């Protein structure tokens, strides 16, 4: 069964375009025996419900970390993650290992769009990329043991790709009573493509290959199919989930005109 879950919230009126904007979410559950599937679905649905109820005009940069924490609480409250942790780690069939001995958890990456900005907030190793003018930029960094070692200069990216600790998550929803989300704001431009994906894609397909596929495939449905096919061809055994969003137009003064995003 697929332990990934995708979701989005689109504005239903011109007023909501300005007051709410757009939200896109992707979660990759961990735990096996359907625990991961429950966790990822609960994470996305909790975030969707919270986003629909946001006060008018609230800043996404403060909202998204709060929604991540609400999703974390929902998973903890489900009763599958105890508040007191041991040092043991749990490995699920997909290979991911959770921090703190948790047996039900999920990654989560969110991208909210309004005016000329994209706010990205995440926990775990699900990613968000920005594709622009033939270049691909990662807007997130993985919360894994090897990624932290790379940032500290202890190992190289090549060593990390095959390292024994590459599946050990240092942060995940449901692993603790509080989880810290990393949040970033970037400007967006017409023609930009935002890509949310699970490690079922980036764990098997290089950033260069992802960039080439997105840049050479204008149709988002075909691009998504090509990305999944590339992951499978590379021997991917994990769930592969991809969400692509194209920015059609941006109004810097506070209005989007028309339907600015092409959602897959």
Describe these PLM feature segments.
Residues 1-264:
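PP2C/PPM-type serine/threonine phosphatase catalytic domain
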């Amino acid at each position: 069964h697929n332990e990934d879950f995708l979701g989005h919230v689109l504005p239903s009126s011109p007023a909501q375009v300005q007051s709410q904007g757009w939200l896109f979410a992707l979660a990759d559950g961990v735990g096996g025996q359907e625990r991961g599937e429950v966790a990822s679905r609960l994470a996305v649905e909790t975030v969707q419900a919270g986003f629909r109820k946001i006060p008018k005009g609230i800043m996404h940069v403060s909202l998204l970390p709060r929604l991540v924490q609400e999703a974390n609480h929902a998973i903890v409250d489900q009763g599958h993650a105890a508040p007191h942790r041991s040092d043991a780690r749990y490995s699920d069939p997909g290979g991911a290992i959770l921090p703190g001995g948790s047996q039900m958890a999920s990654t989560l990456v969110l991208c909210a769009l309004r005016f000329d900005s994209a706010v990205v907030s995440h926990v775990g190793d699900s990613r968000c990329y920005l594709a622009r003018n033939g270049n691909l930029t990662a807007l997130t960094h993985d919360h894994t043991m090897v990624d932290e070692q790379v940032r500290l200069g202890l190992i190289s990216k090549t060593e990390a790709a095959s390292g024994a600790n590459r599946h050990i998550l240092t942060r995940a929803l449901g692993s603790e009573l509080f989880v810290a989300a990393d949040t970033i704001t970037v400007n967006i431009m017409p023609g930009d493509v935002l890509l949310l994906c699970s490690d079922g894609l980036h764990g098997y397909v290089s950033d260069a290959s992802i960039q080439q596929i997105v840049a050479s495939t204008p149709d988002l449905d075909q691009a998504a199919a090509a990305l999944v096919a590339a992951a499978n061809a590379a021997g991917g055994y994990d769930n592969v989930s991809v969400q692509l969003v194209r920015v059609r137009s941006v109004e810097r003064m506070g209005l989007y005109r028309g339907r600015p995003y092409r959602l897959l």
